[in-house]
Amino acid sequence: MADLIDLLHVGRRRVIATYLLAGDEPALVDCGPSSCLGALEEALRERGLEIEDLRHLVLTHIHLDHAGAAGTLVRRNPSLQVHVSAIGAPHLVDPSRLERSARRLYGEDFDRLWGELAPVPEASVRPVGERVLELEAFPTPGHASHHVSFLTAGGACFAGDA
């Protein structure tokens, strides 16, 4: 079952969230930005978990509000596998272009809004196929060309920004 975690972006509720998929191999669907790591850590602890307990990070797309903390999470937990579309994967491995364009857009507010944007080691990246864990994956381009949505066996959909 998926457990919604509000990441309290810049102290505001209902702006950015992640879903925790509990079980033998705990997973997050999207992770939010590094600026929200404190809220994520607190919510995981309330559920008896630490970042180091996570095994999978399933990303709908690479925008900062959905995937900005991916590299920081992998640095803290090198066994974390990051599932992302093949189109989005290179931007996680080398986020320099993504960061450059975001810094132009957000200016001096970038660090406060998004925090660190660390690279994800290529060895930690798993391109999304037809299935990720128990989720059916399917492309949902529009908001982003690399956007992927995930459907549970029970019919719930993790749609990101689709």
Indicate where each model-derived feature is located.
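Metallo-beta-lactamase
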Residues: 90-138
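Active-site environment of divalent metal-dependent phosphoester hydrolases
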Residues: 36, 62-67, 90-91, 144-147
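Active-site metal-binding motif and surrounding structural segment of the metallo-beta-lactamase
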Residues: 38-84
